[in-house]
Amino acid sequence: MTLNLDEAKITAEVLTTALPYIQRFVDKIIVVKYGGNAMTDPALESSFARDIVLLKTVGMHPVVVHGGGPQVDNLLKELGRHSDRIDGMRVTDKDTMDIVEMVLGGNVNKSIVSLINKHGGCAIGLTGKDANLILAKKLMMEKIGVDGVAVPVDLGFVGDVVSVNKDVINMLIASDFIPVIAPLGVDEEGNTYNINADLVAGKVAEFLQAEKLMLLTNIKGVLGRDGEVVTGLTPKTVDSLIEDGTISGGMIPKIQCALDAVRSGVKSAVIVDGRVPHATLLEIFTNEGVGTLISRDLG
């Protein structure tokens, strides 16, 4: 085979450009929340798995937390069941919880593990129930009624994170595994809860004191007052954009997870456009990234 010198030079240039970033993040924990289009497009699924394997290969410690709402919706539809949502949260009765656990802890989790392993990784799948990984409690929610008075809303088996058993994850990391975590938790009575994957990822990053939290989404990032993507934000700036309504709707809980993680010691959090092939690598190995970075060190 004849060496194409021009192509070889380009490859060498790419590798040397990545070197400072590899050195910066070597032996650091990177928590990645995997969801959205990146989980439903085969090409994006493959690029994500290869990205995770590459991070591990060059000495970083990726930890994957995944969603799977569309997959749950599909099975509920096939079974002729309906699931209401309140402010984006799925109302989860006992039967629905069984289906959620089957989809997230079974099919979705094992598919991700299999794909990472196919590309040379050594992934291991977990739910929050394994080794009491995620201690949960029932999520208490209120809505403002027509009379302006807050009324409680019962979402069923929808949970909030109390704590994360970081020792289990650190043990897997030390043994060179890539943990892949389904967003299910268990309370002290043994009840299983469905938990928002962004929330789980943020709490996992917090308890591990990760170097970076990455939330893969179906949008380019946080949009500023001019409608353009804001590439960098401090916690103070985020608070201001929420107060004036620039950040609103479904972006608020997502960015709140990132904000809470940063305020709890995670070095930085980034909302990444998961529709971009190899978004994870582009975020780690380039200055520009592919989303909105939130860090106390900006400015």
UniProtKB/Swiss-Prot annotation:
Pfam families on file: AA_kinase
A Gene Ontology BP annotation from the UniProt entry: L-arginine biosynthetic process
Gene Ontology cellular-component terms listed: cytoplasm
Record-marked site positions (Transition state stabilizer): K33, K254
Record pathway: Amino-acid biosynthesis; L-arginine biosynthesis; N(2)-acetyl-L-ornithine from L-glutamate: step 2/4
Record keywords: Amino-acid biosynthesis, Arginine biosynthesis, ATP-binding, Cytoplasm, Kinase, Nucleotide-binding, Transferase
Highest taxon above the source species: Bacteria
Family: Belongs to the acetylglutamate kinase family. ArgB subfamily.
Protein's name in the database: Acetylglutamate kinase
